[in-house]
Design a protein with these regions (language model features):
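Non-heme Fe(II)/2-oxoglutarate
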Residues: 1-82
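Short, well-ordered beta-strand micro-motif
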Residues: 14-16, 163, 188
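A short coil-to-beta-strand element that immediately follows conserved catalytic motifs
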Residues: 83-92
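Conserved active-site beta-strand element of glycosyltransferases/polysaccharide synthases
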Residues: 95
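Catalytic core of non-heme Fe(II) oxygenases with the double-stranded beta-helix
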Residues: 98-167, 181, 194-200, 204
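Histidine-centered active-site/metal-ligand motif
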Residues: 105, 170-171, 188
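Short, charged beta-turn/beta-strand-edge "cap" motif at the junction between a beta-strand
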Residues: 167-171, 176
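Double-stranded beta-helix
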Residues: 179-215
Length: 215
């Protein structure tokens, strides 16, 4: 594993080899086997959403035990990388189709510390993640690009990741995906005893959803 950058200064670093490529492949295969066993396909999880131009396959850790176990299992190493005592919040797997983008945005409080992990590219072509250089105080609207704000662009291979503070830094993928598809895992943590600790294990969102169902 190789870390490039200064997390305490820039709120992000590139982590090469966070996960072995073989494990990334095995995770994708396990997800597909589990989905098929339930009588569904990846495409049945495709959703239209504001962040993307096209419908994207999205599966959350609440829907998949392997994804949840992956989040919990990475917690010690991400705590070490950030220098903070972390609790897991939530994670999700996403497949972006060819030509898609991820609009520039900042995240909700449950994404205090975030990891964007590349799992697979259908054509082996890196699809960079862009991160703004200016911290944001409040969530901003979705944008196609960063406007006048300078940003960094980080290329990743399968198994590589970017660790960043999703609440404080705007981020996205503003160039169209050059692959037929690409698979990614996004993992989120909050600090134990911190301002966002109430979001550990995604408790705030799950509580709101439960209250909505009872209403």
């Amino acid at each position: 594993m190789r870390v490039t950058g200064d997390y305490s200064k820039d709120d992000y670093v590139k982590v090469e080899g966070l996960v072995a490529p073989e494990i990334c492949t095995a995770l994708c295969q396990q997800l597909e086997m589990d989905i098929r066993a339930s009588g569904r396909t990846f495409q049945s999880f495709a959703l239209a959403q504001p962040l993307t131009r096209q419908a994207t396959v999205e599966i959350t850790g609440h829907q998949s035990r392997p994804l949840l176990a992956f989040l919990w299992g990475l917690t010690p190493i991400v705590s070490e990388l950030t220098g903070a005592d972390l609790l897991p919040s939530f994670d999700y797997f996403r497949i972006y189709p060819k030509g898609d983008i991820c609009r520039v945005h900042s995240d909700r409080p449950s994404c205090e510390h975030s990891v964007s992990l590349t799992l697979a590219y259908s054509d082996g072509l890196p699809w960079n993640l862009q991160i703004g250089t200016q911290p944001v105080e409040d969530a901003k609207s979705l944008n196609e690009d960063f406007g006048d704000e300078p940003f960094s662009s980080v290329a990743m291979k399968p198994g590589d990741a970017v660790l960043y503070q999703g609440v404080k830094r705007r981020h996205g993928r503003i160039e169209p995906n050059p692959n037929g598809w690409s698979a990614h895992l996004f993992l989120q943590w909050v600090e134990r005893g911190g301002a966002h600790m109430g979001h550990a294990f995604d408790a705030e969102l799950l509580r709101a959803q439960a209250e909505g169902e009872r209403a």
